[in-house]
């Protein structure tokens, strides 16, 4: 790859006043660093070389006023070509350019432009015109600048439109996200309320069960004294025992009446001399003496007296 330094020595040797001629130098690339070191070189001739592209840092040579890039093989200019704001004269004759960068509209000082012999886009070619003389090249510069400004404005509007679309899409996404978050909050709130209600019911059920447990001992305690005090005599066996004793007492009473009647007959009537009454009187006397000492009779008499 050929550079100016290897073909023609130091670039300063080629500097003539403010003009640096690097034409016909068989250059494949531009020595940007060396050119940046020569800010006095406001006129730069790079025509008739083998340049296919310009490096992006070439746009930092803002001191350039006149630039000749004719008869190279340039297919496009750097996107930041508009940074060369001091450029007044630009020759792009006989290259392979189809379009110009939008930043070209920033070359507000451009007065002269030649775009002949490039495979330009039809619209751009019509705007540029033929550029056959000085006047037409000046008109070319003016018309191309106006055209590129219009292209820039269109692109800016399109950019703004896309930004607006993106903003609207972002708003929709944010609104959707907010709605989703609100829905999730509402769901969590509902679940929390349901959980709270469930815990409340469990708590109420637990309290009710506890109250029931507390009532049972009280009920049993209330029932126990009544049973002991006899206010509610609900003892079937005692009733059966009482009825049995009543029958027994009745039989004993009848027996006593019968015996008493017989005893009376044997003791106070004329029958007491009869052998049977004599035996009865003897048995009676013995029975009375024994019964007086017997505990059963005392218990019967005591029970009878209590009732």
UniProtKB/Swiss-Prot annotation:
Region of interest: Disordered: 150-241
Tissue: Widely expressed.
One of the GO biological process terms: intracellular signal transduction
Ranges per topology, Lumenal: 266-307
Modified residues (Phosphoserine): 23, 25
Modified residues (N-acetylthreonine): 2
Annotated positions of the N6-acetyllysine modification: 135
Membrane-crossing segments per the record: 245-265
Biased composition (Basic residues): 229-241
Major subcellular location class: membrane
Residue windows of the LRR repeats: 10-31, 40-62, 63-84, 86-107, 109-128
Pfam families in the cross-refs: LRR_1, LRR_8
Keywords, sorted A to Z: Acetylation, Coiled coil, Endoplasmic reticulum, Leucine-rich repeat, Membrane, Microsome, Nucleus, Phosphoprotein, Repeat, Signal-anchor, Transmembrane, Transmembrane helix
Basic and acidic residues bias locations: 154-221
GO CC terms of this entry: cytoplasm; endoplasmic reticulum; endoplasmic reticulum membrane; membrane; mitochondrial nucleoid; nuclear envelope
Residues on Cytoplasmic side: 1-244
Sites bearing N6-succinyllysine, chain numbering: 73
Topology relative to the membrane: Single-pass type II membrane protein
Location in the cell: Microsome membrane; Endoplasmic reticulum membrane; Nucleus envelope
Role played: Required for nuclear import of FGF1, but not that of FGF2. Might regulate nuclear import of exogenous FGF1 by facilitating interaction with the nuclear import machinery and by transporting cytosolic FGF1 to, and possibly through, the nuclear pores.
PANTHER family: LEUCINE-RICH REPEAT-CONTAINING PROTEIN 18-LIKE, PTHR48051
Subunit text: Can form homodimers. Interacts with SGO1. Interacts with FGF1.
Name recorded for this polypeptide: Leucine-rich repeat-containing protein 59
